[in-house]
Amino acid sequence: MGHGKLKKFSENETFACLLQPASGEVLDRQAGGFWSPLNLKDHPMKGHWNEKMFHGRKCPIVLELGCGKGEYTTSLAERNPDVNYIGVDIKGARLWKGAKYATETGLPNVAFLRTRIEFIEAFFAPGEISEIWLTFSDPQMKSENSRLTSPMFLERYRRFLKPGGIIHLKTDSTFLYEYTKAVCKANSLHVLASTSDLYGVSAENGDATSERESLYSSEFSSVCGKAAVDALFEVQTFYEQNFLSQGFKINYTAFTIDHEGPYTYPEFDAVYWRAAEAPRFLPGHCAHPAPGSGE
């Protein structure tokens, strides 16, 4: 391990906005506590984020799962001071950048959590979370249950999302976007917005209309507000900028979990959509981040 990474790990211990739980805080060792979601126990922060981490700021809480270096989390927090944001990732060296920025700029509405996303339900109480962002998550083409919009993950999210809570997916992956659409259809989930080319132009009644203009007049805007539409276009991660510079289209969808499950696995032609995704992996194109990292 390089000296630079060790230095970041050491500095991470000093950031009040970064929670790095030990394994014993979320795993029941008496139940044979290996790293398995079957052996989870509640973390002391569960149900108390606004009180303990955000010093009594009683604001809606939004998660970014697989936040990487945290630039999306911190950017949203700067734009929305009346919302508390928590970026979640397993990579401490990546979280260091976001936590350091939040600390140095004094952002009061940002926190970070270092944990596996499979264990996320150990940290949040029913109704504690208002929205979830999934930004450029690994599409996990070979493992359906590892996809962050799979029925298995929807069941986890349901346990802490407030009624009508929104899940946002922003991705360069056509595979993951089409899979998520199939999941929504199979489970009759309410879709607020969906586009396969976020920065493109669509033809409606013979007129060219940008997706941004379309979203301004959509249900998404009425539910989330026009400021949320602006943020969707104006806040970009490093990877998003890379993908755009190489000509890749950005997909986006927002939906709500409207019922308590069980959630149905969709009919989905994974072979076809893997083939459609193949150009992303040609030499010279931007590689995707490590599985589940989001950055």
Q: Where are the regions that the model predicts?
A:
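Conserved beta-strand signature within the Rossmann-like core of class I S-adenosyl-L-methionine
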Residues: 164-171
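S-adenosyl-L-methionine
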Residues: 100-126
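Class I SAM-dependent methyltransferase "Motif I" SAM/SAH-binding loop
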Residues: 66-70
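SAM/dcSAM-binding transferase cores
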Residues: 1-57, 195-295
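A short glycine-rich, Lys/Arg-flanked "PGG" loop and its adjoining helix->strand segment in the class I
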Residues: 149-163
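A short acidic, Gly/Pro-enriched loop at the edge of an enzyme's catalytic core
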Residues: 123-131, 136
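Conserved SAM/SAH-binding beta-strand->alpha-helix loop
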Residues: 91
